[in-house]
């Protein structure tokens, strides 16, 4: 299942609904760890790999990691970079795969970036569930119509098949460094 929300309370409630006690969760855009803390409560026997590129996240996530022990691993990195995806994919494969992909990249901004990150990461990790917090994507979905029906039952687009880690996209070089 792929769930798209905007309101932070709805996002965190969605996490409570989908995260199971032994899940492996990859969290893209953890910021200072408020949602990470909720995930750790829902998955006390699981693993959480949380990523963020902001300087504010590093200190707070180190504190949270000390509190929670080996349950949480924080990686300071830009989720748009191929090397970061490769690093996380390797870690996830060693621990048995990704159950939940959680994406919160600024909430209301850059729906194109949120979708590209979702597409590349979910195509690679093939999670059972994905939750994305982004106002632009939610607005797009509710403002759109289609006469065609294509469904995916998992947290990734099944129409992607088994492509694995996508090759480097030239388009990624065009993304704004301000994100």
Regions inferred by a protein language model and the residue ranges of each:
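S-adenosyl-L-methionine
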Residues: 1-22, 56-94
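Conserved class I S-adenosyl-L-methionine
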Residues: 22-31
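Glycine-rich SAM-binding Motif I of class I
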Residues: 33-37
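Gly/Ala-rich phosphate-binding loop of Rossmann-like dinucleotide-binding domains
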Residues: 40-41
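Conserved SAM-binding motif I beta-strand of class I
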Residues: 47-52
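Short SAM/SAH-binding signature in class I
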Residues: 92-105
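C-terminal substrate-binding/active-site "lid" region of AdoMet-derived donor-dependent transferases
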Residues: 107-179
């Amino acid at each position: 299942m792929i769930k798209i929300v905007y309101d932070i309370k709805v996002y965190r409630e969605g996490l409570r609904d989908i995260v199971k006690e032994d899940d492996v969760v990859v969290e893209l855009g953890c910021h200072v760890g408020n949602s990470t803390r909720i995930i750790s409560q829902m998955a006390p026997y699981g693993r959480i790999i949380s990523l963020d590129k902001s300087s504010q996240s590093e200190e707070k996530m180190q504190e949270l990691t000390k509190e929670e022990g080996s349950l949480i691993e924080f990686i300071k990195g830009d989720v748009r970079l191929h090397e970061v995806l490769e690093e996380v994919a390797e870690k996830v494969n060693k621990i048995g795969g990704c159950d939940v992909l959680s994406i919160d990249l600024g909430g209301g901004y850059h729906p194109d970036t949120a979708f590209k990150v979702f597409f590349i990461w979910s195509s690679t990790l093939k999670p059972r569930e994905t939750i994305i917090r982004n106002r632009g994507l939610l607005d797009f979905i509710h403002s759109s119509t289609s006469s065609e029906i294509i469904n995916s039952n998992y947290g990734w687009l099944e129409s992607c098949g088994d492509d694995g880690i996508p090759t480097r996209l030239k388009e990624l070089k065009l993304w704004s460094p301000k994100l």
